[in-house]
């Protein structure tokens, strides 16, 4: 169950010629694919492009009507390998995944695809997970474009430009027999807007038809001597064809004055930021009209040399706004100017940050510095300074005004008790060498658990601990999620451990979904999926690959059992890897699934019991060990109105979802017995209501009796 449903929104994909589409960026990309006559689509979920996969899943009926093959691939490599269908056949295909980690995984298939070239249009839609909101290492997709000679599109972040980029991408790919990457930044994926639609097109050749008439071209296979010819073909044929297409179709855009003393070159994705900075300087109006010449690179690779030189003609200085590092575009343009003996002064990273996302303030400051140096007459006196001060001051004070809030597990997360159990084991036995993996469980490396020190790639947690299997007083422990397990972990981590007779402990955290990417189904998901095969146990897979010591914990909230199973894995004399599969459903997905049903049941007048937990103020000792071992967001502190008790007690707020982890932790760690469970009954029966009234009456009598026996002191 994905975190977001597009069942209603996908109906917009049926819009016909001349109708207006209003919606989100990823939905617009899907509509553009259908308008282009795509024959097959695939991909692997991952922010910021996860919702594109969710849209495709919810649009399967529409895809089937158009004879479009859709596949939710096991990994980015599997997705990219799908594009092999466009090598010999004139079929348009598109795949999607996040970048750069997705491209890292897909790089082998991507390089082979680029070497042999394509006949049909091949488009890779990458979500550039860079800057604020990113969850990965900060790198750029540009390196892969230049390494494998794949054309890179970076459209202006508005729906008409994005839709046009999809259309241009397919045509550019076919014109140059080269795959194309379409880069969408985080905000571009979710930008809202409108565009005029065209009719959806069935593929001119479907994959079904192609299967009935197989084709092969030996010279397209990446095998010597053909692979040597591929490299020469890239330079002599494909590159010139791409440059001519970009130039003739005017994929890059020029705005502002036709001539001027200075100019600004930017990636298409930076256009909005540059225009906003110009507006703040009084050099552009609300509609983006400006007198500053702008050269917008909707295609950032390859560059069109004569086009760039024409833009530079008559200018004394040009600013390159290129987000991230290295400065691929700026360096390439500097080389172009050098070869052309140009006299233009090129500026970029000297006035803009070398690395990191270019927020509005960065672009404003860089543009201001550039203008002050090369065209001070264009800079209104005092404009930038008057606008900068409040922003700078508020930024400096922000860390003082807002407390640090590191990411953590969700309330009720079934992975929290796993780390509580592991922390108890470490408190008893000393620190363990723990390797983490990509996924929600990586939050265990932060407070209050602070377990795990590395993450080397999706599904590579156990493999990253391989060097520590050489003995020692404690066995190494590796943590991997079910999503990472099926993505890469079964072979690269568990299979590797079996083959090398690893003595380590592999802890597979199974929450029934690829939860961190949005709750998509995986092979071991328990839900029935009409188009996918689910219900394949992880334990069966690890046994099938050769692991012998395998234990299952089917309720991670049972902290004592979880702790004891970990101890058993650390103590056993069995040779080979010790695998623990700890399973409980992701609380977010469980709430999405159960809450509508519960609300309907309550509305229908039926009896529903909801568990809630609390802390007895009189019993709580105030040492807060429960908070340190649990870290649940629902656990907070409460100051008592009691002069004899200085320390605040633990308190459970209304965000509690009733998972019971707090009580289980207190019981397993033998803490104070202050936690209690209270059942909230909706639509109780007559007997329950009567018992409730009698109970309240009895409690009132006892409280009044107690009050009479309390000593009182009269003021003197």
Residue ranges of each PLM-predicted region?
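Thiamine diphosphate
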Residues: 1-159, 187, 257-260, 265, 445-579, 587-592, ...
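A glycine-rich helix N-cap at a beta->alpha junction
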Residues: 61-72, 115-127, 206-213, 499-512, ...
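Flexible, low-complexity linker and terminal segments
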Residues: 2-26, 30, 156-409, 414-415, ...
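Intrinsic disorder at enzyme termini
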Residues: 604-618, 668-716
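Short helix-loop-beta junction
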Residues: 55-62, 277-293, 540-546
């Amino acid at each position: 169950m994905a975190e977001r449903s597009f069942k209603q929104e996908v109906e917009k994909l049926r819009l016909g010629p001349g109708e207006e589409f209003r919606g989100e960026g990823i939905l617009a990309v899907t509509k553009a694919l259908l308008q282009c006559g795509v024959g097959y689509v695939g991909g692997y979920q991952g922010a910021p492009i996860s919702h594109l996969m969710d849209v495709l899943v919810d649009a399967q009926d529409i895809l089937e009507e158009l004879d479009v093959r859709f596949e939710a691939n096991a990994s980015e490599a599997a997705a990219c390998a799908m594009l092999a269908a466009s090598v010999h056949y004139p079929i348009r295909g598109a795949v999607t995944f996040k970048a750069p980690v997705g491209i890292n995984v897909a790089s082998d298939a991507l390089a082979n695809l680029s070497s042999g070239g394509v006949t049909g249009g091949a488009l890779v839609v990458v979500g550039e997970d860079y800057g604020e909101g990113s969850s990965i290492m900060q790198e750029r997709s540009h390196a892969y474009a230049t390494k494998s000679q794949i054309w890179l599109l970076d459209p202006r972040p508005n729906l008409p430009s994005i839709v046009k980029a999809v259309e241009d991408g397919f045509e550019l790919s076919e014109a140059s027999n080269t795959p194309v990457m379409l880069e969408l930044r985080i905000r571009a994926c979710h930008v809202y807007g409108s565009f005029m639609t065209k009719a959806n097109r069935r593929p001119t050749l479907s994959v079904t038809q192609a299967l009935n008439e197989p084709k092969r071209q030996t010279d397209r296979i990446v095998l010597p001597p053909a692979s040597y010819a591929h490299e020469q073909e890239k330079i002599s044929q494909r590159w010139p064809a791409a440059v001519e297409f970009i130039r003739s179709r005017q994929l890059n855009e020029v705005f502002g004055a036709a001539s001027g003393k200075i100019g600004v070159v930017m990636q298409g994705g930076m256009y909005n930021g540059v225009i906003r900075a110009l507006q703040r300087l009084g050099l552009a109006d609300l509609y983006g009209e400006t007198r500053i010449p702008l050269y917008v690179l909707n295609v950032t690779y390859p560059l069109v040399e004569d086009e760039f030189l024409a833009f530079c003609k008559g200018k004394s200085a040009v600013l390159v706004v290129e987000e991230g590092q290295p400065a691929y575009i700026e360096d390439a343009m500097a080389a172009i100017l050098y070869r052309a003996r140009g006299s233009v002064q090129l500026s970029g990273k000297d006035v803009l940050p070398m690395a990191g996302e270019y927020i509005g303030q960065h672009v404003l400051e860089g543009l201001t510095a550039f203008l002050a140096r090369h065209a001070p007459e264009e800079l209104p006196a005092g404009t930038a300074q008057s606008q900068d001060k409040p922003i700078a001051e508020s930024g400096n004070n922000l860390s003082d005004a807002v407390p640090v809030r590191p990411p953590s597990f969700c309330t009720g997360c079934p992975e929290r008790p796993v780390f509580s159990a592991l922390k108890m084991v470490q408190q008893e036995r000393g620190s363990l060498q723990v390797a983490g993996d990509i996924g929600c469980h990586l939050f265990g490396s932060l407070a209050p658990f602070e377990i795990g020190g590395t993450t080397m790639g999706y599904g590579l947690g156990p493999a990253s601990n391989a060097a520590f299997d050489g003995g020692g007083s404690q066995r190494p422990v590796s943590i991997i999620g079910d999503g990472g397990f099926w993505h890469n972990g079964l072979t690269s981590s568990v299979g590797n451990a079996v083959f090398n007779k690893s003595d380590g402990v592999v802890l597979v955290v199974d929450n029934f979904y690829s939860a961190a990417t949005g709750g998509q189904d995986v092979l071991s998901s328990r839900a029935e999926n009409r188009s996918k095969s689910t219900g394949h146990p992880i334990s069966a897979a690890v046994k099938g690959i050769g692991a012998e010591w395998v234990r299952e914990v089917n309720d991670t909230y049972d902290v004592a059992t979880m702790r004891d199973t970990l101890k058993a894995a650390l103590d056993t004399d069995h040779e080979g890897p010790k695998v623990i599969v700890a399973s409980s459903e992701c609380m977010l997905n469980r709430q999405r699934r159960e809450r509508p049903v519960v609300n309907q049941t309550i509305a229908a007048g039926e009896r529903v019991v909801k568990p809630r937990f609390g802390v007895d103020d009189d019993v709580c000792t105030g040492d807060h060990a429960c908070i340190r071992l649990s870290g649940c967001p629902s656990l907070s502190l409460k100051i008592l109105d009691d002069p004899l008790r200085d320390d605040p007690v633990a308190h459970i707020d209304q965000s509690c979802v009733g998972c019971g982890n707090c009580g289980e932790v207190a019981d397993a760690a033998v803490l104070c017995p202050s936690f209690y469970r209270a059942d909230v009954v909706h639509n109780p029966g007559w007997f329950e209501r009567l018992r409730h009234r009698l109970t309240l009456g009895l409690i009132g009598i006892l409280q009044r009796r107690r009050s009479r026996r309390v000593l009182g002191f009269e003021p003197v």
